[in-house]
Amino acid sequence: GKWNVNGTSFDKVIFCGNIKDLVKMVDGINVNEYKDSIEKLEYHGTTAVFCEIDKNPYSWIYQPSRKHESHRIICTGNFSKTNNSEDLPDNRMTATIEFTDAISKEDIIENLSRIPLNPKYIDHKYNKYTYPIQDANTRQLIRNLKSSLRVFGLYFTGRFADWEYYNMDVAMGAAMDMVKSEF
């Protein structure tokens, strides 16, 4: 069979999005036996808070604490000078401070007052899907779905496609391994 993606036909398609969306998008293949299990897959979201902080030498700071709800500071200003506005004072840089799940702006600002490096709020965004949560059956479910879709030329890989807590390097490796074994 052929796959029609935005008006173009393909023999094979690799899906790298969220598996919850894939089972809703597929036409012509019966994936009903998987829909309930896929829908029940659990996850955590994060609220990413863009802010300025005191300059420091770190890339990431993991900060488990009972003093605030944040779990990590990503020191984005250290990744590239262009990540920092010219308007920032010399002793300041940009960062993203992460909170598990949704948190209000008021609670963010209140938490920032208790976080090291004197963070100053700029903006925030809640991302619903950040961390996939597995149970004892998740990997087998994904293997079974992959096996049943492979015969139709439909493949998938990625953090939320495979429902695996991949870091980017592992996600890229999984994609390259899939291409080597399937194409």
Task: For the regions a language model picked out, list residue spans one by one.
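Conserved flavin/dinucleotide-binding core of flavoenzymes
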Residues: 82-183
